[in-house]
């Protein structure tokens, strides 16, 4: 069942070579990748924090307020499942310039964006209230290193997951899928993942291009199969790495695995929620990273394509809840 979810999330409709990254990533895991990631996230109980890193500045030479629809949408859907299913506290970390649209996605997913103190009150009360916390992050290296340590101490996260988050290369730069340097204005959130690893906090990476945090686990494959791979490959590895056709899809596969493992079909993502989230992302100013247009598409694919992937994942997962004869 989990193998099917992995295959769906890894469909390379965009023909970017990401399907060839799955095998080396899978070789690092004892089970399908969506299940491995879900098990790490399921260690979070009521009131526990999960740090979720996202936000991809796609045209920083124009403005650092222009981010992609891929990433925040998937994180919002997965954060909803962590909140609704486990009463955990998603702590979404992004560029300070993207806090507003990322928060809009979380609200569209049904979560109130609050402070950590307020989130603790919410998760300790018998009356359920779905909440999430958002934080910006420094641009400068030394400040980022200090903030990373402070955040791990403050939140004591059960896991850290980075979704569609461009990762620093060994040269300290960031590059897009064309190999272009787009380091300008980008928060150094890599140090947060690095600090989590040092403190033995479980880490997960989700990406679709080889340049995301986590892809450092399969450097040779990125160099071989991804155009400009030797230029753009991120240096950081994560405990579990999910290459996906679109990073959002990786989140939905993890969400489906969570639903199956927890025995809670109500946690599955839906096409209706997908429409709501992508439209909310565009309305908040996020753009399609491929086209640069502020409209309801992701990675050059229509809303209907993404809704179809969500339906496929749900159909596969639903079989786990049906009695066998």
PLM-predicted stretches and their roles:
Residues 1-49, 56-58:
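Positively charged, low-complexity intrinsically disordered leader regions
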Residues 29-32, 36, 70-73, 77, ...:
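Conserved active-site and cofactor/substrate-binding residues in soluble primary-metabolism enzymes
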Residues 55-58, 165-168, 209:
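Short glycine-rich anion-binding loops that position phosphate/pyrophosphate groups of nucleotides
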Residues 65-87:
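Histidine-anchored nucleotide/phosphate-binding helix
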Residues 87-88, 197-203:
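A short helix->loop->beta-strand "cap" motif at the edges of active sites that frequently abuts
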Residues 89-97:
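Short internal beta-strands
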Residues 104-191:
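An acidic, phosphate/nucleotide-engaging active-site surface
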Residues 210-325:
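C-terminal functional extensions of proteins
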